[in-house]
Every structure is written in C-alpha cells, then in structure tokens.
Amino acid sequence: MNNINISFLKKELDRVNILFKKKEFNLVIQKSKTLLKKYPNQAIIYNYIGLSYFQLDKNKKALEIFLLANERLPLEPSILCNTGIAYKNLDDLISARNYFNKTLNVNPKHLPSHINLGHLENNLNHSDLAADHYLNAYNLNNNSEEVLIYCILSLSAQGKFCEAKKIILELNNKFPKNTKSYQLYSKIHKYKVNDPHQRLMLSIINNPNLDYEDLSNLHFAIAKSFYDQKNINEFVHHTLKANEIKFKTFNDYNFELEEVKFEQIKKHFENFHFQHQKENKGEKLIFIVGLPRSGTTLLHQIISSHSKTFGAEESHIISDFFNKKFKNENSIINFYSNELVNKDACSKLSSEILSKYEMYDQNKIIVDKMPFNFKWIGFIKMLFPQAKIIHSNRNPADSAFSIYRNVFDSPGLGWAYNQNYLAKYVNLYSHLMSFWKQRLGNFIYESHYEKLVSDQVKETKKILKFCNLEFEDSCVNYTKNNIPSRTISVFQVRDEVYKSSINLSDKYFNYFPFLNQIKKKAP
C-alpha cells in the first residue's frame, strides 16, 4: 500500500472514529463497509462494523462480520476476541470460550481475552477459573481500574477477604476518585469504634466535586459502618441520604411500568389450565425465588452443598429470555396466544432454555437463586413441569429494610431507593405470590426464613425431601464448603446462621416510615 493510500485510510478512519464516539452507529457501519471494499485486510474496519452492531443490539450481524474477518485474518487477536464476545452475547458460551482461548494461543498476553474469559467463567459460577483469568489480567496490567475491581469482586466471592482488601487499598491509592472501592470495602469489613476506614470516608464525603453516584457510594458505605457500630442515628441519617441521592441517578424512572407488568402476568394466567401441561421436563432444575434479601442466598448455599447439585447463583437465563420476548404489547400477546398454547412451540422453548442451564453442568441438578424469577413462576410451570420452586418467605418488612440499606449492582431497581416505591413493590410481590400459590398450590414450596434459621437441620431435611434429594451433612455445614457468592450477602454466607436477623426491622419503624406500609405477614 503506497503512502497516499495510507494517508487516505487514516483520514477516513479518523472520520469513522468520530462517528463512533458520537454514537452514529448506522453511519459507522455504512462508511466502514465502503472502506472494506477497498481495504479488505484491515482488522480495524471489521471491528468498527462489529462493535457498532453490538451497540445496536444486532449480535447476529456482528457475528457474521467477525466470522468473515476470521476468514481473511485468522490470526488477528482483536478479531478472534470480538468473535468470542459475539458468541457470548448470543449465549453460545462454548463457542465464546473457544474463541477467547484461540486468541490467547495467538497472544497469551491479550488482556481483553483474559478479562472476557473471567466474565464468562464467572457467569457459569466457575469461580476458580474466573479468578485465574482475572489474576492473569492483573499480572498483565495492575494499573487498570477495571481489572482491579474485577479482582476484588472475584476474591470477595471466594471469601478471600484479606486479599480483596489489599487490592481495594491498591485501588484507593491508584484511583483515589473511585468511590466504588469504599462501598466494596464496607461489604467485607466489620467496623469497630474509631475505625480508620470510616474516618477516611467521613473526611471526603463533603467534597463538592463528587457526583450523585460517588455520593451514594460513600453514604451507603458510611451507613454500613455506623450500622456495625450500632449507632442508629448516624446509620439512619446516611441511609436516607444514600437512597435519596441514588434515586436521582434513575432519570425519568416510571414505577407504573412495574405495576403494569405485574397486572399483565396475573391477567394472562388467571384462567390458564396448567394441568394440560404434561411434558416431563425440568427434573434437573431448582429455582429459589423471593424478594432480594429474603434468604435466597442461604437456601442456595444449603442446597448447592449437596453432592448432586450445582449452584448457579443468580442466573439471568430466565429473566433475559422473557425480557427479550416481552419487548412490546404485541410480542406479549403473541407469546401468550400462540407460543404458550402450542405444544411444539413450548417444547422448543423449554429445550432452548434448558440447553443454557446445561452449560453450568450437564450431570448435576442446577440451582438458580435469581430472586426475581418469582415473576415467571407460571412460565416455569409451563415449560418445566417437573422443576422445583422454593419460595424464600421472610417477613417482608425485614426484607424491605435490608433492601433499603444496601446498594445493588442491577441497573433497573429504581424502586429499591425510594421508600414509597419500595413499599409498593413489596406489596406487588406479595399479591403475585399469593396469586401463584392459589393457582399452583404445592408446586411451590414455602421455606420460611424464620423457621430455617431457628431450626436449620429440621427445615433443611424438609427442603431436600421436596427436591427429591437425600439428606447430606454438607448441607447443614455449608459454611465449610467453597461455594462462591457474588451477591450482597457475600460476607454473611461465610458465617453461621444467626437468629438476630429475625424481626430486624422492628426497631426501625419510627425511622423509616415506609415499613409501616408493608404487610407484616409474608404471603
């Protein structure tokens, strides 16, 4: 290629880059495809097209362009890695893993591939493999903010809190403006009076340059420190501030959309005849559902400690599937009117979902503790009649109190940071669970959190019997097992069951008015 061509290509790619930064992705694709005809061996052009398709949520199109690029540039690391990402976005994790490994065969120091393999193994709850890849990424570049955070989360999930704290301090030193580090530290630290970490947070909370996200991170972490110290007034003050500020980050939040979703579900299942669904699918699936902070993690640790089960943690398989199906009113009506009542269509859907669960482990019973699957119980009954559903039933005021004093990584939980919406959401959940119990009866096992922590052995035996599993001592001694946890309960699951969590909200009714709006009795 002569100098004129190189100069021309550089100018054109600069224009494409500007369009990409402006999020003009269709124009990026159009202009890049024109360039591709003249320069078919330039990896960066394929990457611009594929990455733009990612941004437009056209993952199949992205995969097509990256597979074409593989034919022309079979040893280009960026192409191989992006092909893996395309497969991962399409839930083909086996092919994704193969391409990430191909990248590392070409370039063992390819940082994005180590990170993506870490994410992939993390999604499959293969915590040791994930940790290895994050550690490799750390060894390649320990000055990367995201790499440090991934290592912290991975070590915390494994219960390696001392190692996690060391990297958090490293993150503090290298990226002092990152307030996420304070929140991460607070989750795995028990604060005592005059704790230096608390003093550090208090010294920067009034910095005028902090944005809403930074302020909420700090207030949640400070609230946790005062909660540990049993300083109720300061705990309440910072909890209120944390939630007030966090809610401001949810622009144009519309709670009515939540209410509509709940009503739609009940409407479509009101007169549905479940007994007609005879297909024998789901024997190797256990779903633990309930509100967040209702004891789902405890149940997951207990059941996943059994030799015949594999704990998938909070899998997004079910929720992602239905959220894609229900993009608009027409797609919802079509799903209920056509696919759900068509035996062949139902069988195809259940096989599609089941194949994704089998990626965790083909030989064991998969335990999915995504709490929000309570919304999809009717569908689970339809698609997996032999599955087991366990409802973690805790005093809803206790769950709500715990929700309000914690921050969640999930982006769509605006209701969790507003007292009025939180109370309404809990009551929506209660009504929907009552609806499912009325319609499905013993298909749902009610595990009462208060009974479980009061008599763990007796309740564990009942739960295992419902799951058609023999009792094993490991299920009672679950804290001795190395089952990873990536949820807010990451610190608590390493401790023995504690009864002090029962009626924990009672002393806070005067501080948080929304607790009075929640029905005392669980559904």
What is the role of each PLM region?
Residues 8-38, 48-51, 55:
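Alpha-helical segment of the N-proximal tetratricopeptide repeat
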Residues 165, 186, 198-209, 219-285, ...:
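PAPS-dependent sulfotransferases, especially Golgi type II membrane carbohydrate sulfotransferases
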Residues 17, 21, 44-55, 78-89, ...:
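Conserved alpha-helical positions within TPR/SEL1-like repeat arrays
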Residues 279-382:
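Phosphate-binding active sites in nucleotide-utilizing proteins
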